[in-house]
Amino acid sequence: MSGQLLFFTSPIGLGHATRDIVIASKLNANITFISGEGAARMISDYGFLVKDLYRNKSFVVDDSGELQCAFRWIISYWSYYKKCKKIASNLIDRNETKLVVADEDFAATSVALENNIPNVVITDVLQTSFTKSTLFSAVEKKMNKGMKEMMRKSTLVIIPDYGEDHDNLAYVGPIVREISSSREKLREHFGFDRKTILVTIGGTDAGVFLINKAIRAYNEIKSRIDAEMIVVSGPSMNIGLQGVKHIGYVKNLHEMVYACDLLISLAGRSTTDEADVYGTPSIFIPIKNHFEQEDNARRHGFSFEDIDRLKDLILQKLEAARSDVKASNGAVRAMTLISNLLK
């Protein structure tokens, strides 16, 4: 395993895994992934070697869709970080690691820096802002300071967003999975013979509130629309739903996003990027007080309060025209930047 690339993927949700799969598929390198749970399963499904070692504690979101106990989650994240750092240290010590790539896994980044190993950080979050109180935010600010210092010292920081490169930060644009077929063929493959509303919440159970609200809204207006609703709840949930089609886990969810007529989703970055690139009309509802999702939703003209307008939004968006598929994809540039470090 001489000179290999260790690719550490955050297991929090599936968004990190989806973009890392795209980058890895374009790299000519000896890659071993390290992740956990649903993310590890997805990486394995795409044929990559992955060590399923990470176990994270999910956000606590109440039935109304509001993030609870944010400070407690930050403290539990610190414990998770220390466990991940031990795992990363053991793996890096055992292998002749040429490069460490870490998608929002700052434990692996820390180990790489301590061992003077070239490293790449992939992130769309340059700082967090979960907590509101003065006392708790002081702890978060300290963590942000450490995160920023690690990024400053890293060989390269890849940001899957639009922007101007500076210092060691490279803004490569959205990184999304490629479509394997035409939209018409995909609709036939998935059995989409009517207008199709796709509801998805990513890789955790944090979006159950959105599934329930979306189904309720759909049931109240379905007699007025010729459309079916399909719910993809992700690999970590086992729930029964009435009146809609329910799928637990889909390897190629991105192709369902492309094939559907309307997407209703949490405002996670990877999902919003996929919908943007594929031109799919969408409704993005963030978890309340989840700063990153609220920012993503705001960029698309939505807020948490729109959850009470789902009926009107569904009717409006089902009549919206699709945008053209965007040709630009940051995966190629990300691959090129990483490949240059392997030479």
List each language-model region with its residue ranges.
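A short, glycine/small-residue-rich beta-strand->loop->alpha-helix junction that serves as a flexible
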Residues: 7-21, 205-209
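C-terminal alpha-helical cap of glycosyltransferases
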Residues: 312-316, 326-343
